[in-house]
């Protein structure tokens, strides 16, 4: 399907706007993937706040010009799906987890803070907990001493009340 020049310009602007605020851009090759699998991948990406798009590589190369992802342009060959996210690990995590389930998706490369990553580095990035997970762990660690102190006071008060009643 051939796109006219105006449609291509609009697509490049839309993609540029979507990746302008992204910290991470990950590209994965797909060959022979079923429609249901692609729909599931899109749903997972949407749930995690990841911009996921299949598009022509020439349009993707134009969209990354002037961004921190310009170094990734060399990797844009073949049938690719592009995932971008403001969360540093979300795009890598979505594609990596889906690639584990479906061998027709193969993570090729990624870029984080202007650094190009190979598939192994993207897998490492995907293994890092998300910001929300890290914040919840930090909150739990900070809350544990306080809740322990509160339980200790409650037990002491209960013990005193039991002694006074006897």
UniProtKB/Swiss-Prot annotation:
GO terms for molecular function: large ribosomal subunit rRNA binding; structural constituent of ribosome. PROSITE patterns: RIBOSOMAL_L10. InterPro entries: Ribosomal_uL10, Ribosomal_uL10-like_sf, Ribosomal_uL10_bac, Ribosomal_uL10_bac_type, Ribosomal_uL10_CS_bac. SUPFAM superfamilies: Ribosomal protein L10-like. One of its GO terms (biological process) is translation. The keyword Zinc does not apply. Gene3D superfamilies: 3.30.70.1730, 6.10.250.290. Forms part of the ribosomal stalk, playing a central role in the interaction of the ribosome with GTP-bound translation factors. Part of the ribosomal stalk of the 50S ribosomal subunit. The N-terminus interacts with L11 and the large rRNA to form the base of the stalk. The C-terminus forms an elongated spine to which L12 dimers bind in a sequential fashion forming a multimeric L10(L12)X complex. Belongs to the universal ribosomal protein uL10 family. This is Large ribosomal subunit protein uL10.
